[in-house]
Structure formats: C-alpha cells, structure tokens
Amino acid sequence: KVHGSLARAGKVRGQTPNVDKHEEKEEEDGRAKRRIQYNRRFVNVVPTFGKKKGANANS
C-alpha cells in the first residue's frame, strides 16, 4: 500500500542545500495598501486596444 519503504522518507528534503532567507521589504497594509492598489489599477494604466491585459501581465 505504501510506495517505497519508510526508510526513504524525507530523502529529497534532506539532500537539498539550505538557502538562507533573504530580507524582503515590508508590504503596506490598510490605507497605504489601498492607495498602491488604486494607483496600479486606475492611475498609471497604459491604454491598449483589443483584449484587456491581466493584473499579472508583464507586457
């Protein structure tokens, strides 16, 4: 019923090298977050023809 013996449990995680977590800048919350959201969605939009671009589009 089990795939492989329990001796192999955690093999992949054990052999992956440890990478230190890097500092990320703190995200805004509350009013400031809404402000960024508003600017992203309505203020600096580039008018495009045809299909609407998604929120995660890079082009």
UniProtKB/Swiss-Prot annotation:
Residue span of region Disordered: 1-33
Record's protein name: Small ribosomal subunit protein eS30
PANTHER family registered for this protein in UniProt: 40S RIBOSOMAL PROTEIN S30-RELATED, 40S RIBOSOMAL PROTEIN S30/UBIQUITIN-LIKE PROTEIN FUBI
Annotated family: Belongs to the eukaryotic ribosomal protein eS30 family.
A cellular component term, taken from the record's GO annotations: cytosolic small ribosomal subunit
Compositionally skewed regions (Basic and acidic residues) per UniProt: 19-31
Keywords associated with the record: Ribonucleoprotein, Ribosomal protein
InterPro entries: Ribosomal_eS30
Source superkingdom: Eukaryota
Any further remark recorded for this protein: This ribosomal protein is synthesized as a C-terminal extension protein (CEP) of a ubiquitin-like protein.
A single GO BP: translation
Molecular functions per Gene Ontology: structural constituent of ribosome
UniProt organism field: Oryzias latipes (Japanese rice fish)
